[in-house]
Every structure is written in C-alpha cells, then in structure tokens.
Amino acid sequence: MGYQKLGVNTGHRKAMLRNLVTALFRDERINTTEARAREVRSIAEKLVTDAKQGDLAARRRALAYIYEEDVVRKLFDNIAPKYAGRQGGYTRIVKAGCRRGDAAGMVILELV
C-alpha cells in the first residue's frame, strides 16, 4: 500500500508522523490537516492492535516508533486495555473547518 508525500521530504515526513502519533497517544486528540490525519490514523490503529498483544516484542516495536517512553507506557497500560473487545476502529476523524491561512481542510483526530 502506498503513502502520501504530504509535501515534505522523506525524513521530514517520517519525523512528522512520529511526532503526530506520539501527540495523539499523549493527548488522545490532535488537530491537523485531513491528509496527515489519514496517515496518522493508519499508523495509530496498527500500534494499538500491536499493543493489545502486550508482549515484549510489541512494546519494543512501539518504543522504536513513539518518541516518549511514558507515552508507550500509557499506550500499553491505559489505551490498549480500553479497546480489548474492539476489532479495529480505535480512532475517529471529525471535520473542523478550514485553516485560515491557506484554506486547508482541518480535522480533529481522536481516540474513540
């Protein structure tokens, strides 16, 4: 499956997505553009599904992607158990109008 370039080079895109995923799990909601939210949603859903296993390998994979250790701890101790009975669909995208400067479509990405 492909990915969106998001108007930046590869290193910048990867770092930006890691930052957005870290912020999503830390704050449980983020405000961003629609294209970025769709990319972050895909990554976040996979990380939550992985965290539901709760094993050491899953924790190490999460630590390799998420920047902050306390956010990984929160993902495994608080967020993943909350979705134990749910098969996917851990996030929701709500449209939030357009950005003032360039009229980019803004959304709120939040954990359900």
Curated annotation (Swiss-Prot):
Key words, A-Z: Ribonucleoprotein, Ribosomal protein
Pfam families hit by this protein: Ribosomal_L17 (PF01196)
GO cellular component, one term: cytosolic large ribosomal subunit
Record-level GO BP terms: translation
MF annotations from Gene Ontology: structural constituent of ribosome
Keyword RNA-binding in annotation: no
InterPro entries given in the database record: Ribosomal_bL17 (IPR000456), Ribosomal_bL17_CS (IPR047859), Ribosomal_bL17_sf (IPR036373)
Membership in a protein family: Belongs to the bacterial ribosomal protein bL17 family.
Subunit structure: Part of the 50S ribosomal subunit. Contacts protein L32.
PANTHER family: LARGE RIBOSOMAL SUBUNIT PROTEIN BL17M (PTHR14413:SF16), RIBOSOMAL PROTEIN L17 (PTHR14413)
Protein's name according to its UniProt entry: Large ribosomal subunit protein bL17
Native species: Pelotomaculum thermopropionicum (strain DSM 13744 / JCM 10971 / SI)
